[in-house]
Amino acid sequence: DRPEDPVPLYVAASGESAARLAGRVADGLICTSGKGAALYTETLLPAFEGGATKAERDSSGLERMIEVKVSFDRDRQRALEDTRHWAALALPAEDKMGVEDPREMERRAAALPLEKAASRWLISDDPDEHVEQIAEYVRYGFTHLIFHAPGPDQLRFLEQFGSLVLPRLRARFA
């Protein structure tokens, strides 16, 4: 059975071609944060718009979704340490190519200095600072934010982020 409303389909993109395809055929674009402003403002979002234009689609109704990597904790050191659980994200592509054994990937990630492991994350212990960090993605043009927290205690994150950061985000952007 088909649902009454069509299920929205998004295309994930990390480069220009996939972003253009998303603009041509999908209900939205999805990508991940932490890769530098130029990727979003000069490549992905313009290609997405260009794809929609080429397909004669009105892009104003299309979603621009981003998974924002956030590590928020009232204890800043804990927020920093939590990024260690996803340290592999900070490995350069050439260090991940051809690695088939997850234990080898874990070994490579564990060898990274903490500052490097944390480099793809927005890290803060201050709710207002965190809102400012996240606001960059709204300014780039993203319309749908998904938050990804790295630490093992997801309930702790949800309670703190949900009570301290989300109300400020909603007040500012809702």
Regions found by a protein language model. Name each.
Residues D1-A174:
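Active-site-adjacent structural elements that line small-molecule/cofactor binding pockets in enzymes
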